[in-house]
């Protein structure tokens, strides 16, 4: 199970530059849940560090701020990429997917995001490519 989660997360991070094709429910859910858990672990670790360790962390972050910004940018781009590819699996174009998911901050976007997690994609090829292995 952990190996499978690691593989799907790594696949999303490697395909961060490619918002075309289709992503299965499993790939979308594993990537989003993994990034959420890792972000919560980092925040919890920072919150409970003693003050003398925080100074070391600030020095490290200041020294490697360009690298940390690049890592954060790759994670964010990978999130958008897997979101668009999941929308392609359900037949939505990239603009429609990004617009509907950004409504999450407002009123009805949570319904669309729930649909991305729950609705199964088609097992047939569509205009965005062949079906992912999990849909067949």
Predicted regions and their residues:
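Membrane-interface extramembranous regions at the lipid-water interface
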Residues: 1-34, 80-95, 114-136
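Hydrophobic alpha-helical transmembrane segments in multi-pass membrane proteins
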Residues: 27-53, 58-83, 90-118
């Amino acid at each position: 199970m952990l190996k499978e989660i690691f593989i799907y997360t790594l696949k999303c991070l490697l395909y961060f530059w490619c918002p075309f094709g289709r992503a299965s429910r499993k790939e979308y859910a594993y990537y989003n849940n993994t990034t959420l858990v890792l972000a919560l672990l980092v925040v919890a670790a920072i919150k409970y560090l003693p003050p003398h360790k925080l100074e070391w962390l600030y020095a490290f972050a200041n020294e490697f701020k360009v690298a940390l910004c690049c890592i954060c940018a790759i994670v964010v781009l990978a999130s958008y990429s897997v979101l668009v590819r999941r929308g392609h699996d359900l037949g939505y174009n990239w603009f429609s997917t990004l617009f509907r998911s950004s409504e999450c901050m407002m009123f009805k976007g949570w319904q669309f995001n729930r649909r991305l997690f729950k609705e199964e994609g088609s097992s047939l090829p569509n205009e965005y490519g062949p079906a992912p292995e999990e849909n067949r």
